[in-house]
């Protein structure tokens, strides 16, 4: 009977459920967790899995729950994903502000952002949906005579955007705004008002 109970509970993982990830794929998280061969639930404590995940530079936190009776594992991730690549520093800036040498296929900041604006700039980027961030090809600090906190964005779809720090969260509505102009190409001014100057066809 004792041997039967041990054998019953020492079974392999059947299902792994992952949530909270946008940058990392499910398979990458499974590989980082060292669960790719769906090992025994008994030999892989929740704490051990969490520790493996938190060692990864792109993961800031992880919650792991197991249902050993149904051989299921639930993993919830908080990502430390890349925000942009700094052309000046030649480094990638992560969500937590850390700079790493690795080059990512992400938005490139092409010039220096003044230190007095930098922290707020990072905080604003953290609040933009990662799917919108991935639509930005380049960002340039571009003040004029009137507005100091002004930026120019080159979008992957060919549009240009002028925006100020206080309007940055408007970027989360970017797709809806562009759609309202029948997906035509042009310059979107979010630095003063909200209007769209369509390119000559």
What are these regions (language model features)?
Residues 1-7, 11-14, 31-40, 48-51, ...:
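Charged, solvent-exposed interaction patches on well-folded alpha/beta domains
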Residues 9-12, 22-26:
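Membrane-proximal juxtamembrane linkers immediately C-terminal to transmembrane helices
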Residues 18:
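Extended, alpha-helix-rich binding/interface surfaces that flank or overlap catalytic cores
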Residues 56-57:
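Acidic-histidine catalytic/liganding microenvironments
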């Amino acid at each position: 009977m004792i041997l039967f109970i041990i054998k019953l509970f020492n079974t392999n993982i059947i299902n792994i459920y992952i949530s909270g990830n946008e940058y990392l794929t499910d398979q990458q998280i499974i590989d980082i967790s060292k669960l790719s061969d769906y090992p025994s639930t008994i030999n892989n404590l929740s704490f051990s899995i969490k520790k493996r995940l938190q060692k990864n530079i792109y993961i800031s936190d992880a919650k792991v729950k197991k249902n050993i009776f149904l051989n299921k594992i639930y993993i919830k991730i908080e990502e430390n994903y890349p925000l942009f690549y700094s052309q000046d520093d030649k480094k990638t800036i992560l969500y937590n502000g850390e700079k790493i040498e690795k080059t990512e296929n992400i938005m490139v900041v092409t010039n220096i952002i003044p230190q007095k604006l930098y922290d707020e700039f990072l905080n604003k980027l953290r609040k933009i949906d990662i799917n919108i961030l991935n639509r930005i090809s380049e960002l340039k600090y571009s003040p004029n005579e009137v507005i100091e906190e002004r930026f120019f964005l080159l979008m992957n779809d060919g549009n240009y955007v002028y925006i100020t720090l206080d309007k940055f969260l408007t970027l989360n509505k970017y797709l809806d705004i562009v759609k309202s102009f029948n997906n035509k190409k042009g310059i979107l001014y979010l630095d003063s008002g909200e209007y769209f100057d369509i390119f000559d066809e």
